[in-house]
Curated annotation (Swiss-Prot):
GO terms for molecular function: ATP binding; ATP hydrolysis activity; metal ion binding; P-type cadmium transporter activity; P-type zinc transporter activity. This is Probable cadmium/zinc-transporting ATPase HMA1, chloroplastic. Changing residue 53 to S: In strain: cv. Landsberg erecta. Residues 145-153, 202, 385-398, 758-762 are lumenal. The chain crosses the membrane at residues 123-144, 154-173, 181-201, 203-223, 362-384, 399-416, 738-757, 763-781. One of its GO terms (cellular component) is plastid. It comes from Arabidopsis thaliana (Mouse-ear cress). Mg(2+) binds at residues 682, 686. The keyword Nucleotide-binding applies.
């Protein structure tokens, strides 16, 4: 089956980038945004760029010139490598515009004295941060382990060596933020740490910075876990392909080949590529020679290996398990399935949900409020609560308490609350489900109704032609004086015309007609021109149709629904006769019907479709566990629609719908029922309804490009079992996000209150604060697990699992007793 063309939705967020000759950019990790960096500037502004290497919080500052990105490179390989460089570091970094004059001056000064280079070095070596933390801990235990005369000297030595390891980069970060008018978590922590030093508590200040860095290293580890599937996909993307050299138009032969290794992005459509055992198919292609056993588990989650033989379509990224084959590229690297999956998943991570957008706006203002409150406590505390301004042996001072509030109230835990969205997106990608943004999960969780298209969605879409029946305008008889069209010839003529009109179509009815015509002795029909009417049918001018009395000539042919064909007849009496003939058909009403009209002769094409395996279970799950209102929206007639509906368990059916009717039904039902509506389809006829629905879901393997473009969720597997998974995952994600926000606020309160009251030291405040942040991260990672509808369902599944194991255990016991 041909892989889907994953078309980027026009609704996807685009990130503007300012242009300027002397624009200074500060690229660093922002705890309130997780966006992929993009370097799309056509000018060459000076900027500070970020490179995240081993330590997740290590941000490399350097002055570079932006890459001229207009795709006119002299060396394509260099361009390709440049892309991979940015992809490698793009999971959790964002470029912040830093155009203020103070920032430029500060950076120039820092660069001149080597501050930038030293900060880069310290950030890139994780062991230095760990060493600093170890030195601070050693200084803390010196009073208990070291001889008394050496305590002060050892503590000073540890502090002098350890503090610069964490303080150099922290001070540069904070000063750059302050110079740009930013007040964030880095500024708050740096202020608290250096204020502690000036107050004589250098040990606590050092511990604060060390624990902050280590905690955020752990935080970034959990954040990177959410992107692990995308990374694996990108790593499985081959860098090169074995391009077969074709000389003088000769057809390549698998037994005698001449090939060379070329960069994968240089493989053109129509090129021949050799794929051996263990290799990855570089681009979407068609097997030309040979055969192989392939797996696409990492693309769609489909575990079962597939056999690929000549003529089969294979998606880029498929792994060749066994065999050797020549494939012909059908798409370039940029348009191939694997690259599109990576693109869509990365864009889904970058399309921020409502909560994260709110946190982006809230974060900076919140940090400023924390600074104001801290200053108020520092200066008003001595007057209101009789605290000393600086700490004494008997009481912690107001400045110390203010620093504790500054640390405890930092919004780190709130900032990582949306991490649950990232884990959900990766979990869906692992199952072969692509979401066009985290906001889709919020929308999906709010839906109370789900509507399914019938043909190709609830059914296999593999329609089979059962009969061709002339019903109107055909003359029969043996009298030679009457212009006759004997029935066998009419059936052949009708099939030939219909197959010619539907050649190359993706519609299930059209595919069934074309498949039925293969291998049959049919007259040659040529389509001169045609016009398509979405959801109704098509008309064409055909050549090659002959009668007994005359040679072939151009004739008008129409193919589509009964209503479409009857609407083309001017006489109401003729339309009624055709409808009566359809109702009186000896084949009954349960089949799917298509009608063909050629010069007022109408032929009925009877087709049969079967429900997909497992669809009834999906519908039952959506009804009983998801509590969704389930309905069918189809363009088929009522008897065919109800036959499928009864088979799968749907009790609400709307049939004989044109695309505009489906669109209106979606709008009206969503408005009347309240809440959102999910539309599941795959054809171009479903595109308007998919676009109007709260969430549109398509089966990507057989969907039209239009349906894919407007859909919010793409199911890469060719079944709808992913629909209940999506609904359950959305509800799990919204629940996790709510839990994260509650945990974040609780951790802030529990760390801030005792700190302001003077019950805990500054280093313990940091520990409580960062502990809350790590707790939120750990809770978010739960989103990588499969969701469940409720704890009751978990218990039912556990009981069923135990019951299924009982016969096995009893039989094993009987065998052992027999021995």
């Amino acid at each position: 089956m041909e892989p889907a063309t994953l078309t980027r939705s026009s609704s996807l967020t685009r990130f503007p980038y300012r242009r300027g000759l002397s624009t200074l950019r500060l690229a660093r990790v922002n705890s309130f945004s997780i966006l992929p960096p993009k370097t799309l500037l056509r000018q060459k502004p000076l900027r500070i760029s970020a490179s995240l290497n081993l330590p997740p919080r290590s941000i490399r500052l350097r002055a570079v010139e932006d890459h001229h990105h207009d795709h006119h490179h002299d060396d394509e390989q260099d361009h390709h490598n440049h892309h991979h460089h940015h992809h490698q570091h793009g999971c959790c970094s964002v470029e912040l515009k830093a155009e203020s004059k103070p920032q430029k001056m500060l950076f120039g000064f820092a660069k001149a004295i080597g501050w930038v280079r030293l900060a880069n070095y310290l950030r890139e070596h994780l062991h230095l941060c760990c060493s600093a933390a170890a030195m601070f801990l050693a200084a803390a235990v010196c009073p208990y382990l070291a001889p008394e005369p050496y305590i002060k000297s050892l503590q000073n030595a540890f502090m002098i060596v350890g503090f610069p390891l964490v303080g150099v980069s922290a001070s540069l970060d904070a000063l750059m933020d302050i110079a740009g008018g930013k007040v964030n978590i880095h500024v708050l922590m740096a202020l608290a740490a250096f204020a502690s030093v000036f107050m004589g508590n250098a040990l606590e200040g050092g511990l604060l910075l060390a624990m902050f860095n280590l905690a955020h290293i752990a935080e970034e580890f959990f954040t990177s876990r959410s992107m692990v599937d995308v990374k694996e996909l990108k790593e499985s993307n081959p860098d090169s392909a074995l391009l077969i050299e074709v000389h003088n138009g000769n057809v390549p032969n698998i037994s005698d080949l001449s090939y060379k290794s070329v960069p994968v992005h240089s493989v053109e459509v129509g090129s021949y590529v050799l794929v051996g055992t263990g290799e990855i198919v570089p681009v979407d292609c068609e097997v030309y020679q040979g055969s192989a056993t392939i797996t696409i588990e990492h693309l769609t989650g489909e575990v079962k290996p597939l056999e690929a033989k000549a003529g089969d379509r294979v998606p880029g990224g498929a792994r060749n398990l066994d065999g050797r084959m020549i494939v012909k590229a059908t798409k370039a690297w940029n348009d191939s399935t694997l690259n599109k999956i990576v693109q869509l998943t990365e864009e889904a991570h970058s399309n921020k949900p409502k909560l994260q957008r709110w946190l982006d706006e809230f974060g900076e203002n919140y940090s400023k409020v924390v600074v104001v409150l801290s200053l108020a406590i520092a200066f008003l505390g001595p007057f209101l609560f009789k605290w000393p301004f600086l700490s004494t042996a008997a009481c912690r001072g107001s400045v110390y308490r203010a620093l504790g509030l500054m640390v405890a109230a930092s919004p780190c835990a709130l900032a990582v609350a949306p991490l649950a969205y990232a884990t959900a997106i990766s979990s869906c990608a692992r199952k072969g489900i692509l979401l066009k943004g985290a906001q889709v999960l919020d929308a999906l969780a709010s839906c109370h109704t789900i509507a399914f298209d019938k043909t190709g969605t609830l059914t296999t879409g593999g329609l089979t032609c059962k009969a061709i029946e002339p019903i109107y305008g055909h003359q029969g008889g043996t009298n030679s004086s009457v212009i006759t069209c004997c029935i066998p010839n009419c059936e052949k003529e009708a099939l030939a015309v219909a197959a010619a009109m539907e050649k190359g179509t993706t519609h299930p009815i059209g595919r069934a007609v074309v498949d039925h015509s293969v291998g049959k002795d049919l007259p040659s029909i040529f389509v001169e021109s045609f016009e398509y009417f979405p959801g109704r049918g098509l008309t064409a001018t055909v050549n090659g149709v002959k009668t007994v009395a005359e040679e072939s000539r151009l004739r008008k042919a129409s193919l589509g629904s009964i209503e479409f064909i009857t609407s083309l007849f001017k006489s109401e009496d003729e339309s009624k006769q055709i409808k009566d003939a359809v109702n009186a058909s000896s084949y009954g009403k349960d089949f799917v019907h298509a009608a063909l009209s050629v010069d007022q002769k109408v032929t009925l094409i009877h087709l049969e479709d079967q429900p997909r395996p497992g669809v009834s279970g999906v519908i039952a799950e959506l009804k009983s566990w998801a509590r969704l209102r389930v309905m069918m929206l189809t363009g088929d007639h009522d008897s065919s629609a109800w036959r499928v509906a009864n088979a799968v368990g749907i009790t609400e059916v709307y049939c004989n719908l044109k695309p505009e009717d489906k669109l209106n039904h979606v709008k009206n039902i969503a408005r009347e029922a309240g809440g959102g509506l999910i539309m599941v389809g795959e054809g171009i006829n479903d595109a308007p309804a998919l676009a109007a629905a709260t969430v549109g879901i398509v089966l990507a393997q057989r969907a039209s490009a239009t349906a894919i473009a407007v859909a919010d969720i793409l199911l890469l597997r060719d079944n709808i079992t992913g629909v209940p998974f999506c609904v359950a995952k959305s509800r799990q994600t919204t629940s996790l996000v709510k839990q994260n926000v509650a945990l974040a606020l609780t951790s802030i309160f529990l760390a801030a209150l005792p700190s302001v009251l003077g019950f805990v030291p500054l280093w313990l405040t940091v520990l409580l604060h960062e502990g809350g942040t790590l707790l939120v991260c750990l809770n978010s990672v739960r989103g990588l697990n499969d969701p469940s509808w409720s704890w009751k369902q978990d218990i039912v599944h556990l009981i069923n699992k135990l019951r299924s194991q009982e016969p096995t255990s009893s039989s094993s016991n009987s065998l052992s007793s027999a021995h």
